Amino acid sequence: MASPSRPGNDCSHVIDHSHVPEFEVATWIKITLILLFLVIFVVGILGNSVTIRVTQVLQKKGYLQKEVTDHMVSLACSDILVFLIGMPVEFYSIIWNPLTTPSYTVSCKLHSFLFETCSYATLLHVLTLSFERYIAICHPFRYKAMSGPCQVKLLIGFVWVTSTLVALPLLFAMGVEYPLVDVPSHRGLSCNRSRNHHSEHPETSNMSVCTNLSSRWTVFQSSIFGAFIIYLVVLVSVAFMCWSMMQALQRSKQGTLAAKGQQLQLRKSESEESRSARRQTIIFLRLIVVTLAICWMPNQIRRMMAAAKPKQDWTKAYFKAYMILLPFSDTFFYLSSVVNPLLYNVSSQQFRSVFAQVLRCRLTLPHANQDKRLRAQAASTMDSARSVHRPLIFLASRSNSSARRTDKVFLSTSQSESEAKPQSKPQLLNHESPESDSVMKPANPATENGIQEHEV
């Protein structure tokens, strides 16, 4: 077994304050990152704000259920809070002066706690939205018993309470400290470290930053590892629910194709519309899963690197990899909050249309009931036009068929009445008389035409 001090008894391979100038980022890279983050900030705030307005309009017009609207609004709010809390600190502390930024303990703790809370609120909102759609599609009867404003408030409350509990340990684990302070009761590298003013008197060091406290190392590790497990559980759960919903829609489609008759055909068209809306929701959720997996994974890897071993044991290669990963992980993490409005627009043409209308401050979306009435009137007009242009011989055959069917219906009615009431007076109405035609004629001509066309 090789000696741990083989690379050098002076710990030259281990990171030290003297190595800080080697990892300073060039000014042009800092300016580029600030401009990139500024674009992400503006697009994220604008996109999520417009998303809140669009969902409210769609609900008011009858195109979106209130349960889904509440989930989407809460998700957009958590994304906005991520930008408002994280970006200002990102601009100055992490990008411009990542290694020498002074900070206050209270602001460090509050920023870490609030940022973690809003980040995991976004993650858990995806879970609750997927769960709500999963129950609605795979267990519709249970959904009717569970759905309602009270249940939605409970789910949203669960999201924020759980995310608060996930972030709570950071209130105790984070603080302002010289990052290379020895962790108590931790067996580090067995080599001779150079002692300096920063390590011997960290409380007066001018290189103190907002980092995990050495005295709370176990709390910090538990918090990061626990949050990573929650991240994996959410990804697996949402992926499983999306797969189950796709299977349920596939079974529903096969059952509908086996239906016959006009009444069942009507149900088929109605369920096709609902399946289309549900399919759009599933597409959105699948895109969300892919986005979370891609955009959150670099940030999770960086966090795991920070919690894997204390900074006092970081080598120069380890620290260099961490600093290279830092801007990429932060960029992808904020993109995950920007991409939600884009996914809404990709997965729903109606959302895309209303989104553009809100940006132009010109809403022209009709109510859902009005749209259905217009389609029904257009269909009725087309049916009437087709019936006017039919050949006379076809119309005559329809009339004869209608007369024969009317006789059959009338005779069966007379027979049933005579059997039920033998003492009553027999029917005196002639089947071929005009009165008979007037009695048996339906009140709605469109309905009569529809029945005759179907049976002919």
UniProtKB/Swiss-Prot annotation:
The keyword Ribosomal protein does not apply. Pfam families: 7tm_1. Disulfide bonds join C11-C191, C108-C210. GO terms for biological process: G protein-coupled receptor signaling pathway. This is G-protein coupled receptor 39. The modification Phosphoserine is found at S397. It is found in: Cell membrane. Residues 1-34, 90-109, 173-217, 306-323 are extracellular. The chain crosses the membrane at residues 35-55, 70-89, 110-131, 152-172, 218-242, 284-305, 324-344. Glycans are attached at N192, N206, N212. It is a multi-pass membrane protein. GO terms for molecular function: G protein-coupled receptor activity; metal ion binding. The keyword Nuclease does not apply. PROSITE patterns: G_PROTEIN_RECEP_F1_1, G_PROTEIN_RECEP_F1_2. Signal peptide: none annotated. Zinc-sensing receptor that can sense changes in extracellular Zn(2+), mediate Zn(2+) signal transmission, and participates in the regulation of numerous physiological processes including glucose homeostasis regulation, gastrointestinal mobility, hormone secretion and cell death. Activation by Zn(2+) in keratinocytes increases the intracellular concentration of Ca(2+) and activates the ERK/MAPK and PI3K/AKT signaling pathways leading to epithelial repair. The lineage of its organism: Eukaryota, Metazoa, Chordata, Craniata, Vertebrata. Interacts with HTR1A. Interacts with GALR1. Residues 56-69, 132-151, 243-283, 345-456 are cytoplasmic. Keywords: Cell membrane, Disulfide bond, G-protein coupled receptor, Glycoprotein, Membrane, Metal-binding, Phosphoprotein, Receptor, Transducer, Transmembrane, Transmembrane helix, Zinc. Zn(2+) binds at H17, H19. Residues 406-456 are annotated as: Disordered. Belongs to the G-protein coupled receptor 1 family.
